[in-house]
């Protein structure tokens, strides 16, 4: 049995009872990485020297002081688009190949304040653009359940590392499903918080109105621990919400009697696989047995979500990625004779194909002749999608459906057709457009690959999302399954 099979509360008790040292946890992480990461390919950089030194320092603090952080001694992996001082942050892109940040992201500072131990940086789709982690400039991460399949994306490294037992917890980011989809594919728990719940300061921007950092863990309880540690307003991020952070752990009561669940017919319609539908219906039966009720509803504008998302996110990306020009930091081409050529060559050589595709789409949507027809119209549809959610939440507590239409697909299966790749996010994208919280929890298997149940809540009501997710988790054994590597 791995130490990482224990929850945070159990590990902290073991530390304080002197049954284990924090150094043992860090050892376990690096030994497991050495054992399996050549297969899984989840990590890009390790911070072993600093992590071991910090673990030793924390070991001395067990008796040395009475107050300890919320994540005292817990090893964690961080997605490589979250800046870490003294540890390279590449966004899995050639253009940031040697970028060494001079400051920590707010979430990293909050992890440090909670006394977590950063193990290293995790692979991802380049600039978080992708659904399979095949778009990394460095390596393709594999799904620990079947090494021939993708782990999902863009936080594929974050989900795969937790599923493979390399770290017990990780941070990812979610712009259109990039935490929930890989969590579903890898059989772990992943939450996209309400937009504004967690500071984005130090998160390299893809689409600023959609991006949100969140936790990936083995259990719902651990997920709530991590969100507790990283949430809250931040003066460095004007989009962080000035709202009180509740005690998320107090929501994990197991009691969902009388709770009203909405199931959108669009989430079980055409394009959603038989196994995904069956697993959701089985999950709804579990929730019914626990005292909740459910009804079918409609989110009528969901059918426009995919097109709306790719217009808006690509438009924001084209603006955000304009800063990577070869002048201030990052890769600089040697094949240029003048400034204009330097910009062209640096960006052509430094960005991968998917990033360039989205920059071009965004630039087109924002161009003067097409702005009203594309970008402005997409913003109007986004408002309608948000209104759909608000209407449903007037009557219901949560929305439930599959996280993804199918389990993980084969590596290379969708890379030649971007539209089939994009369609994989069809059930997660509306949550980002509406800015509401959503979690994926394991709910079954298809052909030996995990499936995820998506639970969506009202703005800033992660507590109810956790309550339902935890009740379901405790009534089932799906989260206990582990891949064999």
From Swiss-Prot:
It comes from the Bacteria. GO terms for biological process: translation. One of its GO terms (cellular component) is glutamyl-tRNA(Gln) amidotransferase complex. Keywords: ATP-binding, Ligase, Nucleotide-binding, Protein biosynthesis. InterPro entries: Amidase (IPR000120), Amidase_CS (IPR020556), Amidase_dom (IPR023631), AS_sf (IPR036928), GatA (IPR004412). It holds the Pfam family Amidase. Disulfide bonds: none annotated. GO terms for molecular function: ATP binding; glutaminyl-tRNA synthase (glutamine-hydrolyzing) activity. Its EC number is 6.3.5.7. The active site is at residues 79, 154, 178. It is an enzyme of class 6 (ligase). It catalyses: L-glutamyl-tRNA(Gln) + L-glutamine + ATP + H2O = L-glutaminyl-tRNA(Gln) + L-glutamate + ADP + phosphate + H(+). Belongs to the amidase family. GatA subfamily. Heterotrimer of A, B and C subunits. NCBIfam families: gatA. PANTHER family: GLUTAMYL-TRNA(GLN) AMIDOTRANSFERASE SUBUNIT A, TRANSAMIDASE. Allows the formation of correctly charged Gln-tRNA(Gln) through the transamidation of misacylated Glu-tRNA(Gln) in organisms which lack glutaminyl-tRNA synthetase. The reaction takes place in the presence of glutamine and ATP through an activated gamma-phospho-Glu-tRNA(Gln). This is Glutamyl-tRNA(Gln) amidotransferase subunit A. It comes from Bacillus velezensis (strain DSM 23117 / BGSC 10A6 / LMG 26770 / FZB42).
